[in-house]
Amino acid sequence: RTFEAVQYYLLQASSRLAQEQGACPAYGDTFYAQGIMPIDSYKKDINKFCAQELLLDWDALRQQIKDHGLRNSTLTALMPCETSSQITNSTNGIEPPRGYVSVKASKDGILKQVVPEFKRLRNSYELLWSIPSNEGYLQLVGIMQKFVDQSISANTNYDPARFDNEKVPMKLLLKDLLTAYKYGVKT
């Protein structure tokens, strides 16, 4: 629901701006100019584990874009947010936190950062190293990608301590890579 709303209202705002100020010069080169939205081109394997119906009126939005264009040629990409998370005291974008407290080093020094609203949300956080596999994470990224018009910076993580000789098997790496492809992850 969240990513549907984000993309929908960004497109709606960009189309309104195009109505006021004209479409961006590259609009004609976009998929949007051809009437193609991210919801039209996502990998349908997503529907096997997320059958959520669209909640917003995409047909009306498609017509609005057809009539007025877009002020922006692209609108969404998800990045790691490593630096900005320090400024805003947020987690690293869509990545699960490594721990409740993390230590981040930069040219300005060392920063100890506690996850937002630790006392209230402590039991709601899923920590990176407690996730048994990347499957659920890749499913979530695939669901997000259904609405994002660029790519998502997504990382798969492996705790070497869980594997023989502390070596992550190539078979597992390939499985996760193919799973990401299957779900339409564009990173």
Q: Model segments located where?
A:
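Extended, well-ordered alpha-helical scaffold/bundle regions in very large, multi-domain proteins
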Residues: 1-45
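Catalytic alpha/beta core of large soluble enzyme barrels
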Residues: 19, 23, 32, 40, ...
